[in-house]
Amino acid sequence: MKIRVATRGSKLSLIQTEELLAQIKAVEPDIRFEIVVVKTTGDLIQDKPLFQIGVKGVFEKEVNLAVLRGEADMAVHSLKDLPSDLTPGLALAGYSRRAPPNDALVSPRGYTLETLPRGAVVGTSSVRRAEFLKAARPDLEIKPLRGNVDTRVAKILSGQYDAAVMAAAGLQRLYGGAPPIPAVPLAVEDLPPPPGQGIVAAVAREEDTWLTDLLRRASDRKAAAEAAAERAFLAEVGAGCHVAVGGIARQTPAGIEFTAGYAQGGRKHLVKVYGEDPTEVGRRAARLVAQAMKKT
């Protein structure tokens, strides 16, 4: 049997897709896959920060439309790119094993957040990253930086930036253990990641129950539990890419530990929530963050 898989065409997207498809093939070895590459709004518009594009789901909308139109059977995404409300008719059903969810400080000299020189130029087009950086180091100069991972790394190495903040998961998946530039993980307390970072997710039509069942059987259980908490947080807090909110769940033997935060105007507010039910833990964390947002 052949499954048509819609995905973006970047090198990292294709690597992530193959990672998730390998999990599926481990469950159903006889399945074959056909990759359907789709261009998204986020791929086509490279000269603006994401929050200025003004379109929800800039990296996922067109990919999911391919599934709804019958041009593909399933779609593969970075979970962090999926909005909390999926297009009606689609189901979020599959999760890869999670790569490190942290953001990382990328620089030729291997700077940490503490050792960055005063006034250093740090590249990011993320409101979340920019606001948390300002809260930790108000002396830094934050400049927009977009493009695929290779493009951003090249701009840092060329001296246009002293450092940049990027997802550790993308760097690991793209370069393995030999990145072309040092990357120092940032503690989630310093820079809470976006919900879903490090997890690759699969979307299929709700009516295609055979495929959604297969995706659930192939899913990593730990990643699925953490995703449930983070998706509940995302839906409850209602923040898009224009708000500096982050939230990350960690499954432990005792249950779910959730770290979330909000930053604005050089100040940040962090919360920690613990519990057994992922959805409830995510919602409680969101309510605490929402209270902090109202006070600023």
Curated annotation (Swiss-Prot):
InterPro entries the UniProt entry points to: HemC, Porphobilin_deaminase_cofac_BS, Porphobilin_deaminase_N, Porphobilinogen_deaminase_C, Porphobilinogen_deaminase_C_sf
Keyword Transferase included in the entry's annotation: yes
Transmembrane segment boundaries: none
Any Gene Ontology CC annotation: cytoplasm
Cofactor note (record): Binds 1 dipyrromethane group covalently.
Record-listed E.C. numbers: 2.5.1.61
Keyword Lipid biosynthesis: no
Single GO biological process annotation from the record: protoporphyrinogen IX biosynthetic process
Entry keyword set: Porphyrin biosynthesis, Transferase
Reactions that this protein is recorded to catalyse: 4 porphobilinogen + H2O = hydroxymethylbilane + 4 NH4(+)
Pathway info: Porphyrin-containing compound metabolism; protoporphyrin-IX biosynthesis; coproporphyrinogen-III from 5-aminolevulinate: step 2/4
Residues bearing PTM S-(dipyrrolylmethanemethyl)cysteine: C241
Further remark: The porphobilinogen subunits are added to the dipyrromethane group.
Family according to the record: Belongs to the HMBS family.
Function: Tetrapolymerization of the monopyrrole PBG into the hydroxymethylbilane pre-uroporphyrinogen in several discrete steps.
Name this polypeptide is given: Probable porphobilinogen deaminase
